[in-house]
């Protein structure tokens, strides 16, 4: 699929304490592998740095800002917010706030560690049948409030990603891809390919709502292909 390739999920040292990726190094890596867009989705934080924007433009990369919101039901990628708003750790409130601004919500890595019984003790969700996507949807209440599902995440196992894709298909969703990079070598390992070029978050949301996109993988090693 030809189009604009965007990594929907990255973290930098400017806004995520668990990241060791300098944003300038991230942009250099994006240019090197032919990635046209980067969504910077810091943890519970939206920052604005025009120097980053200018540097990205000079290198042929477009920056889109989002927030990875930590909610009571897991991480949710939020697009359309200019700053963190109190109370959005509750998914229902986050949904209301996003609707008010015409934004978009993505369930990030929704099945990470949830398919392995050894990790069941750390989750409050019911057990999930790895062979039945319906059970995954029923187990995660957050999926009732989001617009899309991250079906390929660079830090998830193949099983987790394929299961997320199966659940997305069950719900009639295409799924998106993001590397979840915290260091620059993994930038672009999972991407979302848009049919049309966009330059603002508003345009990005418009393309998502129009369904003109598909998840992809392997760009970081020069083996770009669609997922799965």
Where are the language model's segments positioned?
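Conserved beta-strand positions in the central sheet of alpha/beta enzyme cores
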Residues: 39-40, 106-107, 150
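Active-site beta-strand/loop signature of hydrolases that rely on acidic residues for catalysis
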Residues: 36-44
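Internal, conserved structured core segments that host functional sites
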Residues: 102, 106-115
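Charged catalytic cores and adjacent phosphate/nucleic-acid-binding surfaces used
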Residues: 1-12, 16, 20-29, 35, ...
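Short, conserved beta-strand segments within well-ordered enzyme catalytic domains
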Residues: 39, 62-64
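Short, well-ordered beta-to-alpha junction loops that form the rim of enzyme active sites
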Residues: 43, 109-110, 178-181
């Amino acid at each position: 699929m030809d189009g604009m390739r965007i990594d929907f999920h990255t973290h930098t040292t400017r806004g995520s304490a668990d990241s060791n990726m300098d944003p300038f190094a991230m942009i250099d890596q994006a240019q090197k592998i032919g990635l046209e867009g980067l969504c910077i989705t810091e943890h519970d934080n939206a920052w604005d740095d025009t120097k980053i924007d200018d540097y990205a433009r000079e290198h042929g990369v477009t920056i889109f800002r989002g927030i990875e919101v930590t909610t009571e039901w897991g991480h949710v990628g939020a697009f359309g917010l200019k700053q963190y708003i109190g109370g959005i750790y509750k998914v229902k409130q986050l949904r209301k706030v996003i609707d008010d601004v015409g934004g978009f919500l993505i369930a990030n890595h929704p099945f990470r560690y949830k398919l392995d019984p050894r990790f069941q003790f750390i989750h409050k969700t019911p057990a999930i049948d790895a062979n039945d996507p319906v059970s995954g949807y029923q187990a995660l209440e957050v999926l009732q409030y989001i617009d899309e599902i991250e079906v390929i995440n660079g830090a998830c196992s193949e099983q987790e990603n394929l299961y997320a894709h199966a659940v997305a298909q069950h719900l009639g969703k295409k799924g998106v891809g993001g590397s979840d990079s915290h260091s620059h070598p993994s930038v672009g390992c999972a991407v979302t390919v848009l049919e049309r070029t966009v330059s603002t978050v508003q345009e990005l949301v418009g393309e998502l709502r129009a369904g003109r996109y598909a998840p992809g993988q392997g760009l970081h090693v020069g083996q770009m292909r669609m997922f799965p």
